[in-house]
């Protein structure tokens, strides 16, 4: 299957051609990908199957391991192996750390993420990696865009590690706005925003939320937290619960999306 390729209008030449993007551009790209992959998700709210998306649409291999992290407080939830390489995993049977060879085009999800009750974390972790694959393929492989003015010679000495490790703080971003990001932080933001954009596409998300607001008798625009207890419950519990049930995301991800789309404001 041929995927919808991402071609940014601007890149940071000093940082491996990391795309310079507005969130709106990622929303538009995510919608184009969904239109190509599973268009029904643009007309009817539902939960995307991240494993099918990664394997069948993006053509990635998918593996599950006990990923070793050198910092237990910052566990690695998932990683993308753009080029063949070795990664460290924990061998529970022999109680030791070992290095395994992983083929190119592989996404590894930590086994702990796949435990029962963590479906929303697994979904976001998988689609976060999908964001790196679709938006940052050229950044980590050195491949250039076809006919793109941003092409550059690939310098192995200056190349980024083609194995991207995504820790909990990269995937469970709190939604805080930070303008002065490093190139790496921007790439993690791109991947995180893409995950939210393709899991909860604006084209279905806004009508879905508006419907819940109307069903609860609210027609006055954004809800500002802290002014009315009943509205606080609607904004921070009732609507997020409905989003969680429909899209398969965590309640926190639902709350962040409500604020990013202007439905809920903090006082």
Feature names for model-found ranges:
Residues 1-267:
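Active-site hotspot residues in diverse enzymes, especially metal/ion-binding acidic/histidine motifs
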């Amino acid at each position: 299957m041929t995927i919808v390729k991402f071609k940014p209008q601007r890149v940071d030449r000093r940082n491996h051609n990391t795309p310079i993007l507005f969130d709106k551009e990622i929303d538009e790209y995510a919608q184009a990908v969904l239109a190509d992959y599973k268009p029904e998700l643009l007309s009817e709210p539902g939960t995307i199957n991240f494993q099918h998306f990664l394997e069948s649409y993006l053509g990635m291999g998918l593996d599950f391991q006990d990923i070793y992290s050198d910092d237990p407080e910052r566990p690695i939830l998932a990683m993308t192996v753009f080029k063949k390489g070795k990664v460290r995993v924990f061998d529970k049977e022999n109680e030791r750390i070992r290095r395994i060879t992983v083929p190119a085009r592989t996404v590894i999800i930590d086994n702990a993420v796949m435990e029962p009750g963590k479906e929303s974390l697994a979904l976001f972790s998988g689609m976060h990696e999908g964001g790196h694959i679709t938006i940052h393929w050229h950044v980590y492989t050195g491949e250039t865009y076809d006919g793109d003015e941003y092409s550059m010679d690939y310098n192995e000495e200056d190349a980024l590690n083609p194995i991207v490790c995504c820790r909990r703080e990269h995937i469970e971003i709190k939604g805080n706005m930070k303008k002065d990001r490093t190139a790496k932080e921007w790439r993690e933001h791109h991947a995180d925003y893409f995950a939210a954009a393709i899991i909860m596409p604006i084209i279905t998300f806004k009508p879905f939320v508006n419907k819940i607001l109307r069903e609860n008798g609210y027609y006055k625009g954004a809800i500002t937290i802290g002014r009315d207890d009943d509205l606080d419950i609607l904004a921070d519990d009732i609507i997020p619960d409905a989003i969680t049930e429909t899209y398969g995301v965590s309640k926190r991800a639902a709350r962040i999306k409500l604020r990013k789309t202007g439905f809920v404001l903090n006082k």
